[in-house]
Amino acid sequence: MAKRKRSAPSTTVVAGNSVTPPLALAPPQASESSHPPVNFQVITGSYDKVLHGFIVTIPPTSPSSSATSTSLTLNENDAISLPATFTDSFLFTAHTAPIRTLTISPPSANVLQKRILATSSADEHINLYTLSSALPPINFQKLKKATSTLTASNPKNKNLGVLSHHLNTPTAIIFTPNRSKIITAGLDAQIHILRTRDWAPLSMLKCPKPKPKPVNYATNHGDGYGPRIDTFNSEATYGGGAGGINDIALHPSQKILLSVGKGTRQVRMWNLMTGRKAGVLALSKEVVPPIFGSEGMKVVWSKTGGEYAIAFDRGVVVFGMDSKPKCRIRTTPISKVHQIRYINLPTTITQNKKDTEEEEEEVLTISTEDGRVLFYSTTGLESLDSPNLIGFLGGRSIGMPGRVKDFDTIALKGNFHLITGGTDGVVRIWDLGKDSEKDTHEMKKVRIDGGEGRQIGCLVGIYETERRITCLGVMEMGDEGIEEEDVEMSDSGSGSSSGSEDDDDYE
C-alpha cells in the first residue's frame, strides 16, 4: 500500500482548479522579537445575495521575495504557498436581490471602535449592521452554506435595522468622516442625508428627470400604429430610468457633493450647506470621447480635494477644481472600467523623481475587466492624453484574467495592502510593500501593445469565496478586549435641510 504524503498546514492554491484554501485554525504565533501579525476583516457582497466576512492574518515575516507578483507564474500543476491565512467570521443571506454596494463607516482616530456596515441591493432596502473591531474566538469550522447569522462567530456584531426611504435601487452609500451622517443615492434620482445617531432624515436632494423626446410612430414603429413593447418601462413608474444616480462623491470639506446619473452626459455639484444645486458641468464630446461611453458610472474626489475623477465604461477623465480636464485615461489594451479610487503609495514604488520629503504620493487606481489594477499619477502631465502609468497588478500576463469588480486598500503597521475581488469569487491580498525598494528596482517590465508597464506589489494571499463578488470592504481588527464603546457622534459638517434644484427659497 502506497503511503500518503502529509499535507502542509499552510494556505495553498492550485492554479486552474477551483480549490478553496484551507481555513486557518489559529493565527500564527509571533515570536517575542518579532512584531505582531497584521489582522483585518474583508466583507464581500455577491450576486447570490450573501454577505461574507472573513479575517485575514498576515505574519510579520512574510517571504516577499518568493511571492513577488512579477515572478509569479501559474501553471496547471503548480502550487503556491502564500503566508496569509483566513478565518471565516460570518456568512448569511442579507438581501432578496443581488447586493449592489456596501460601505463601512470610517475608523475613529487612534481608537478602536465598532464600525457600521451599510449594504444595498435591488430590493430598495439599505441594511445596517454593527461590526466589532475585536478579534473573535477562533472558529474551527469553515462556513460553506449561507445558514449562519451575523453573530455566528462574534456575538458583538449586531443588526441595526433597515432603511427604506428610496423608491428604487440604492446605488451609492457614503459616511461622513466624523460618522455623524450617512448619504445615500439611488436610481430614483434622489439623494438622502440621514443622521446616524437616530437615523432621522435631514435633507433630500432631487435630480431632475430628462424630458422625454416626442415619438414619431410612423418613423420609429414601422407599419404599426402603437409603440413597441419595449417602450413600456416599469422603471419610469418607480423612479428609475434616465436621470437615476449612478454614484456620488463627497468633498473632504463635507460641503460639496458630486453626482453622475444615467442617460446624462453631465456631472452635478450640490452645495450641502444650503441644500441646493451648485452647478452642472456638461461633458461634451471634445472632453469625453464617444468611445469612453455615454454616462458617468463612478465619481471620486482625491483625498486632498484638489481634483476629481469620473469613470465611464471604457475610460476615465480627471478634472481639476476649476472643472477643466487635466487628464484622460484610456487603458491599453482597451478594457471596461469597474472601479476607481485614490490611494496613497510609497514614493519607493511610484519612483517620483521630484525633490520632495513626502514618503507617500496620491495616485489614481483603476480596476478593469481583464483582471488588472492600474496605478496612474495625475501630476506633472505633459498633455491631456498622456497619463503617467506607474504600474499595475494582475492581468493575463501572470494568469489572472478575471474581472476585478471592486477593490480596497488598508495601511497597517507600515504595510500597504490592496484587496481585490471579482465575479470569479476569488479574493486576492496584495502587499504593496512600503519597504520594498529593492524589489521595486528589480521588477520585471511587461510589454503591452508597444508600451511597457511594470508589475508592482507581492501576492500574499488567495481566498475563494465560491460566490460571484460584486463589492467588498475592509476594516482593521484589533486584539480582543481593547475595543471601546461607541462615542457620541458630532453633528457638524453638513447641512440639515431639504431641497431640490427647483426650489426658489431656502429655509
Language model features by range: what are they?
Residues F54, I126-L131, I191-R195, V267-N271, ...:
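WD40-repeat beta-propellers
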Residues H192-P325:
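Solenoidal tandem-repeat scaffolds enriched in leucines and small polar residues
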Residues T57, S132-A134, T196-W199, L272-G275, ...:
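Short loop/turn segments that connect beta-strands within beta-propeller blades
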Residues G45-D48, S120-D123, A185-D188, R195-T196, ...:
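Conserved strand-to-loop turn within each blade of WD40 beta-propeller repeats
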Residues S18-P22, P27-P28, I482-E507:
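Acidic, serine/threonine-rich intrinsically disordered low-complexity regions
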Residues S34-N39, L102-K114, L167, I173-S180, ...:
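Loop/turn segments within WD40 beta-propeller blades
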